Structures are given as C-alpha cells and as structure tokens.
Amino acid sequence: KQASTLILKELKAFQAVLKTQALKHKMTPTIGRSHGIHAEPLTFGLKVANWYEEVGRNIERIKRARQVISYGQISGAVGTFACIHPEVEGYVCAKLGLKPAPVSTQIVQRDRHAEFFTALAILAGTIDKISTEIRHLQRTEVLEVEEFFSSGQKGSSAMPHKRNPVVSEQMSGLARVVRAN
C-alpha cells in the first residue's frame, strides 16, 4: 500500500510534466506516423496529450488495484478463527490501514496481488512505449526531439560528440524488468 502511494505521487508529477509539455507544444507541427511511415501532420502537443491521457488511466488503474490489495487476515491456519476472535482481526487490520479479508485461508488470496502487479505491468508498458518513441524521435535521421543534455555530459565514451538517449534507454530496460517479473 505504501509503495502504491509513492508510485501514484511520481505518476501525478509525471502527468503534470506531460500536461505542461502538451500545452507548450500544442502548435508545434510534426509528422504523424502510422506503422512507422509518414502519415498526416499533427502537433507534438497532441502526441504528448495522448501520453498524458494514458498515464491518467494508469493512475486510476493503480488506485483501483491499491484498494484490491488493501486487505489483511489473521483468521488462523485455515481461516476459521479457531484461535482468535474476528474482532481482533478487524482491530489489527484497521491499525495497519487494511480491511479484513471477507473470506480467506491462511493467506490473503493471491489474485488480489496479481491484479496489482498486472496494473504495474500495464504502467511499465506505457513507460516503455513513451521512452521508445522518444528514442526513435532522437535518432539522427529523425531528430525531432532530444533528451535533456547537461553541459559537460558525455554522449559516449568512445564518441563524445554523440547525444545518446540514455534516460529513455534506462526507462525501457527497467520497464522490461517490471513486465518480466
């Protein structure tokens, strides 16, 4: 539950940045692509607005999943309350910010956690999609956008003139790790 609070905080900050960029570039023309091929013109702001909306859906998905996992149980080895009164379970769960699982065995059922991790995997897919698009748009032959590059930053150990999309590459890689687990 605490992890989801941190994730939501960062997602809301990310969404705010996307909103700022979408508004800033609402009139910045770029080429739309379909299957990687030039299609019709659009604005970079529209592209970013789509990311903004998708991140918003991820925020709502994580919120719903957080509610689904916010259950606990101490109803005994097989969930029969043989050694403890249900009121004790209610008290302990309330202290932990959880709700008592209506029915359980020795554990809270894992489908609750599976839903949360599925929401994380979908979020990771969004992050990978955005970072892959930025990497593509930073390619030399496209060069429509670039990641921030601070003064003194080296682009490549062997070719310092390069401006590699390091952050986007890291985001894609970490998103794959999330989806794989």
Describe the residue ranges of each PLM region.
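Hydrophobic alpha-helical hairpins/lids featuring a short glycine-rich hinge
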Residues: K1-M27
